[in-house]
C-alpha cells in the first residue's frame, strides 16, 4: 500500500486574467477552485493509474469535510485528523505573461491533532510506503518529520520525502527511499545549483552522499531527472504552454511511483512522470489528464 501524508491541506484558487496592472482594478476572466495538498495530489494521481492508495491528512471545517467526501467518492481511502479551522486557501494567478503563487501558512495545529496523526500512522506495515509531502502548518515543529520517519522504520515501511523545509538535510541521514526536491528547494536549502546536466550530476552525487538512496528532481514545468546512485536519467521533449506549475511536481511523483514501486523500468516510469507533470502544468489544478498519452509519445529518456 502507498500511503500519503499531508499535514497542510488547502483549497487552491486558480485565477486567469489579463496582464496585471498595479494600483488598478484587475478583473479575472475566470477562476477555478480545487482541493489540494501535496500528498492528496500524489494519491489522486496514483488512483488515476489504478494504484491502491491511502490518504492521511489534517482537515478542518466545512471545506475540509467537503475535500474528504470528494476523495471518498473517488473510492480513495481517507483517514483524517480533524481540526476546527478550515484549510488554507492558496492563490495562483496566470495573467498570460507571468505566473504568481500566493501560498498561505495554514491554521495552527494543536497537540491533540498531532497525536491523531501519529495514531493514524500506526496502520503502516512492513512492505508499505509512506510519501510525506508538503509544508508544515503552524504549531508543528520540524522534528515531527523525524518522529514519523522513525515510526515508519520501526514498522519496516519505506519513506518518500517531498518537503521544502530546510530540515531535509538532517532527514537525509535517516536514508529515505526516495526524495523529490525541485530546483528552487535544492538552491535554497542545500545551496545546489542544477542549471545544466553537469550541475545536476554533481547535485545528485551530493544528495546520495548525504543519505538519499534515490532522487527524483523536478523543475516546475520543465522535465525531470532521476538518480539511483549509479546512473542519472533525463527526459527530453517539447515544452507545453504553462497554465500553472503548482501541482506538476506532485503529479510527476505520483506517476513515477505508480510504475517504479512496481519494479517497472526506470525509463518508462520517468517518461510517465514527465508526461503527467507536463499535462498537469498545462491545466488548472490537476486537470483532466487527457493529453498524457499524447505527450508520452513525444518523450525520450536518456541516461547521462
Swiss-Prot record:
Assigned keywords, A-Z: ATP-binding, Carbohydrate metabolism, Kinase, Magnesium, Nucleotide-binding, Transferase
Superkingdom of origin: Bacteria
Family annotation (InterPro entries): 1-PFruKinase, PfkB_dom, Ribokinase-like, Tagatose/fructose_Pkinase
Cofactor: Mg(2+)
Active site: 250
E.C. number: 2.7.1.234
Pathway: Carbohydrate degradation
Catalytic reactions on record: alpha-D-tagatopyranose 1-phosphate + ATP = D-tagatofuranose 1,6-bisphosphate + ADP + H(+)
Function statement: Kinase involved in a D-tagatose catabolic pathway. Catalyzes the phosphorylation of D-tagatose-1-phosphate (Tag-1P) to D-tagatose-1,6-bisphosphate.
Family, per entry: Belongs to the carbohydrate kinase PfkB family.
Name used for this protein in its record: D-tagatose-1-phosphate kinase
Protein's organism: Klebsiella oxytoca
